[in-house]
C-alpha cells in the first residue's frame, strides 16, 4: 500500500493535479484556508494516469471490500471514477446527488439499488468528511449496506477521521496528504522547509499561523 501511495502521489504531481500555495493559500467553500488544492478531475484528461488510478481503485476494492455488489460515486467528482472502476470490475454502478432532483422522479440516488445490497462509495478526495458522510447516510437510509469508502486522496485531517469513525464507516485512500508533501519536496515542487508548514495545516486547519512564513 505504501508503494501505491507513493506512485499515485507521483502521478498526481506529474499531471499537475496538485497545486501548492503556502504563501497565498486557497480558500475552500467551507472557509478553510489551505496551502494545497488537489483537482482529481484532471486525472480524467491523462489516459496513462487514469488507467493507473482506476486499476489501483479496482485492486483496493477487491482487497478491502471483496463482497462489494454495487459501486456508488459521489456527485460530481466521484461519478467518472466509479463508472470506470465498475466497468473494469463488471459491477453495477450509480451515484448519489447532493440533493434530490426537483423534476422527474426526484431521485437523490441515481441507478438501481436494492435494499440489503453491499455498496462501496467511490470518492475523489476526503477533507473534513462531511460530504461523503451525507452520501453514506443517504445510502443507509435507502437500505443499502455500506461496506465503506474508497477514495483517491485524503488530507488525513483529524476532523475527517473522527467523523468517519463516529459513523462507523471505513475509508481506504490510494494516497494521502503526508505522502504528497514528502514526494513534492523530494521532486522540488515545494521547498523542504514548506513540508512542516503543510503538515501544520493538516494537523489543525483552524490554526493559520503557518501562512506567510516558515515555522
Regions found by a protein language model. Give the residues of each.
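PRPP-associated nucleotide enzymes
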Residues: 1-122, 130-215
